[in-house]
Design a protein with these regions (language model features):
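Hydrophobic anchor at the start of a short beta-strand
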Residues: 48-50, 131-132, 162
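Catalytic-core regions of hydrolytic enzymes
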Residues: 2-114
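Active-site-adjacent substrate-binding region
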Residues: 112-142
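Long, well-ordered alpha-helical scaffolding segments within enzyme catalytic domains
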Residues: 33-37, 43, 114-126, 177-200
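Short, well-ordered coil/turn elements that cap or connect secondary structure elements
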Residues: 44, 97, 129, 157-159
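Short alpha-helical interface elements
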Residues: 63-67, 74, 108, 127, ...
């Protein structure tokens, strides 16, 4: 018997956001690879897992991604990403930024911050990267409404336990090297599955 449904959202599409320091490497592809590994680890622990991208070519809308969690009464929605900085003073400064951060839904779920912290701690430790903390973001004129579409739509369709993990910066040489390595992605999958196994 399933312990509950987890929805994994591999962010972007196959060729979304090229790694600037590596040839033929894209955030959307690496997100999908990590999601597939995490799916296997969660299923081994008794969870049922649904993917917003069932093939690497898929690129559903933000609403479709969040709606999948609500429609299936998911216990947890996890959107898998890596990060890139905004404007920087120099190329060196741009590539120097690194670290993990987790955004959690503003929906009325008291354990969201606790789960976000556990997920972020696992990523920071596994990647040996900077801890950029756990965060929320709302619209400036609409406090309490999630800024990020997948969190907003997952809450609107009935899944308040929702997170975005920014697994380091694919613009940083150390983080990018980790995220482009299949063995390292497997280590991340195990670490994140262990957290979900404990909190649900």
């Amino acid at each position: 018997m399933s312990r509950g449904i987890i929805v994994l959202d591999a962010g972007h599409g196959q060729f979304g956001n090229r790694y600037p320091l590596l040839e033929n490497t894209f955030e959307g592809t690496q997100n999908f690879k990590l999601a597939m590994r995490l799916k296997a680890e969660l299923e081994a622990r008794g969870f049922a897992v649904l993917l917003t991208r069932n093939s690497i070519e898929d690129d559903p809308s933000l609403e479709e991604r969040g709606k999948l969690a609500g429609d299936n009464h998911a216990a947890l929605f996890l959107s898998i990403h890596s990060n890139a900085p905004g404007a920087a003073s120099s190329p060196e400064a741009y590539h120097a930024v690194r670290g993990s951060e987790v955004y959690y839904s503003l929906a009325d779920e008291p354990r969201n911050a606790e789960i976000a912290r556990a997920l972020n701690d696992a990523v920071v430790t596994t990647m040996n990267t900077t801890d950029r903390g756990i965060k929320t973001r709302s619209y400036p004129d609409q406090p309490g409404i999630n800024y990020y579409g997948v969190l907003r739509h997952s809450a609107a369709y009935g899944c308040p336990t929702a997170f975005i993990i920014e697994h380091g910066f694919h613009t940083n040489p150390e983080d990018a090297a980790f995220l482009s390595n299949d063995e390292c992605l497997q280590r991340l999958a195990v670490a994140e599955a262990e957290v979900i196994d404990k909190v649900l």
